């Protein structure tokens, strides 16, 4: 279904760029809704899952909160609060940073890794079921989105 049909737009868009931007926003919300619904089953928010993925990619090496923020998809998230919630669930550890006592090092625990593995199995299935794109089309879309952001 086209974006015009999805949002029941009767007038044409002012430009192709406007149409693309509206479509990206609409699709972002659609993806967020489906991913959030799945993550809720595990008691995680999309932002908490993002923190766990970032830490899991560190292969056991800790990161400071600021390093986590730099890598997050949602830069407006309160990373300290997210880490606190993950700490309460034993998904991460916090240790005072030896080089900077104002900072703290955060690392994923085995429980956090287990949670990631469980979620990823279902997320891969969800993403495969939602994607109507070939691998080539998905790569092209990713390149176009990078270009849209001027990257």
Each model region followed by its residue ranges:
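C-terminal regulatory/oligomerization modules of transcriptional regulators
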Residues: 1-12, 136-151
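N-terminal leader segment of winged-helix/HTH proteins
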Residues: 1-42
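Pre-recognition alpha-helix immediately N-terminal to the DNA-recognition helix
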Residues: 23, 50-54, 114, 140
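N-terminal helix-turn-helix DNA-binding core of bacterial DNA-binding proteins
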Residues: 33-75
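Short, hydrophobic-biased segments on the C-terminal half of alpha helices
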Residues: 65, 83-84
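Charged, amphipathic alpha-helical coiled-coil/dimerization segments
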Residues: 84-139
